[in-house]
């Protein structure tokens, strides 16, 4: 039997951004009950990615009280080394020079997912609905009617705001018909976990090579997370290699600055594209995180951008009488635009500038890297951006 239940907010998607949004809002609005519709039966989906959490993201997790249990599984980014292999361009950024102990932390997405999931279960005004898929919504004057599937049941309920945190293939976005602007970089990201002969000791590397940008992020137990951007053909070739040959290919591309690469596990590849929704709000609906934008991983900013979506939305709704009113959603969209332009502009320019071997461009980007190393105000501004701070 269909049943009707009223919630001030329904969040489609209980992944990282959806769960975080629910916690941020629930902690400040004890008078609201928030329902999360999560398609998986037992908690969030298993996620094998490794995430680079900006310092501002870590601060948010600390505020929510979930970082304490995660810290032992994370590895701090205390230094960043950026270089263009075979050229003079190189810059080093040290956290202590910018007044922080670390510019971020590296952690497995599955660990963070589980911690946020448990925190949601412990929150009395969050109702976690497993095996539940958002289907459609019909707006009215002061509410929006939602239909979702739970198991074999079709259930109807009403809410004041639907938050689409349901990923790149967002059903909330598709139900509205919001178009996406897409840039295909004609690259694939090859990701893997490397076992090293020595620890990275808090160093993260962004190495621009002839074959494509290659990032190494520090992990516990003398491991590193690899993100290697390659042409589709090159990515297929690399993925077809044996583990031994894959290690040799990585070592040849990166060099020996991080020491010897010994073993590889958890190899995968995925297409690298920029997706940005033409609007992020529509009649009592808002899309956030990967539902509204996905970025190239070159600067590790994608998830952190989604975290700032959650923070901004929760701050705007802190004193809202009706969370779905255009007054609040319009303010949300307006506030997020500058951050989108800034981060998308940064990542897009890095991809285009460092994936091109045209000689004048190579010379220009190396001068830019050297300038970044020599000019503290410019380096400080860049560091603040990577740490997720707006100023």
Where on the chain are the PLM-derived regions?
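Beta1/beta-strand and adjacent pyrophosphate-binding region of the FAD-binding site
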Residues: 2-15
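Conserved N-terminal helical subregion
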Residues: 5, 70-76, 81-175, 184-188, ...
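Glycine-rich FAD pyrophosphate-binding loop
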Residues: 24-49
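N-terminal FAD cofactor-binding segment of flavoenzymes
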Residues: 48-85
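Conserved FAD-binding catalytic core of PHBH/FMO-like flavoproteins
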Residues: 61, 153-156, 161-267
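FAD/FMN-dependent oxidoreductases across multiple families
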Residues: 236-324
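C-terminal helical "tail/cap" subdomain of flavin- and related membrane-associated enzymes
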Residues: 315-391
